[in-house]
């Protein structure tokens, strides 16, 4: 076995900011099981489905993830006082009780190291970014996100990196995937723990060296993002609002392939 393969085997790929069609806010066209299929193909070990203002809690998806060796962490992307934050290993009841950053501090005081909170896309002008307020609320966060959308001079992550260095806060790369093809290129790698548990993943994120994979956006990526943000998604959202919510029925067949619509 080559040294590169040995080295790769000692690390686990994780993505802690992903959306699926379960999202109550955005119109997503791929399912949690389709995400699991792709994650397995690409060798991911840890995922978090971060619905907007809701905790992903579908027990069958957690069971199916575990069956293929993927640790799925319950999570949510919550907007507080106009700013998005991502909370990992939280319950729906805990998220429902969050209205202010002071509530976040109280939650952290109760839960300690058993939760992990990071600031997504903090200095991007769209999408509920926390902006300069991050400096005031930095004690609420365990990490700062390295946003996937960057190219050349278009890179607000530079400001995020300065804040992270100033406060000694780790940065983590994520995909923030809203389309399935966007998943898999932007992620964080952690040293492989002896046992793959939420506790060990959080400890690695806080204390271990991290590898961040986040290549610059290509011209195709830029065009796709602009099309999605300003054309495709607003159209799908209006169409869904006119039609009303729809629900899919889980398949009774076995295997992830049979569950790709859920």
Name each region found by the language model.
Residues 52, 120-122, 175-177:
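Short, well-ordered beta-to-alpha junction loops that form the rim of enzyme active sites
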Residues 1-16, 20-37, 58-62, 66-74, ...:
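Charged catalytic cores and adjacent phosphate/nucleic-acid-binding surfaces used
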Residues 43, 69, 112-114, 168:
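Glycine-centered short loops/turns at secondary-structure junctions
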Residues 102-112:
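Short, charged N-terminal beta->alpha structural module
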Residues 114-127:
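Aromatic-lined carbohydrate-recognition surfaces of secreted/lumenal glycan-active proteins
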Residues 98-99:
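Short acidic (Asp/Glu) patches
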Residues 36-56, 116-118:
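Divalent metal-dependent hydrolysis catalytic cores, especially in the metallo-beta-lactamase
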């Amino acid at each position: 076995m080559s040294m590169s393969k040995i080295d790769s085997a000692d690390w686990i790929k994780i993505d802690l900011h992903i959306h699926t069609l379960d999202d109550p806010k955005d119109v997503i066209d791929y399912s949690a099981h389709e995400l699991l299929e792709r994650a397995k193909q690409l060798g991911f070990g840890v995922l978090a489905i971060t619905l907007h203002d809701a905790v992903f809690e579908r027990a069958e998806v957690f069971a199916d993830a575990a069956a293929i060796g993927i640790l799925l962490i319950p999570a949510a992307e919550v907007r507080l006082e106009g700013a998005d934050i991502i909370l990992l290993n939280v319950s729906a009841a805990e998220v429902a009780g969050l209205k202010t950053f002071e509530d976040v501090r109280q939650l952290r005081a109760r839960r300690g190291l058993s939760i992990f909170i990071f600031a997504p896309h903090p200095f991007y002008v769209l999408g509920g970014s926390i902006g300069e307020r991050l400096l005031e609320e930095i004690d609420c966060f365990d990490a700062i996100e390295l946003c996937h959308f960057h190219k050349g001079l278009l890179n607000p992550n530079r400001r995020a990196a300065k804040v992270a260095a100033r406060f000694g806060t780790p940065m983590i790369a994520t995909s923030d995937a809203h389309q399935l093809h966007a998943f898999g290129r932007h992620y964080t790698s952690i040293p492989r723990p002896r046992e793959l548990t939420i506790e060990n993943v959080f400890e690695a994120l806080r204390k271990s060296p991290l590898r961040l994979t986040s290549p610059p956006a290509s011209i195709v990526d830029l065009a796709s993002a602009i099309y999605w943000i300003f054309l495709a998604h607003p159209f799908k959202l209006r169409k869904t609002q006119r039609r009303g919510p729809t629900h899919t029925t889980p398949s009774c067949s076995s295997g992830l392939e049979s569950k790709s619509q859920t």
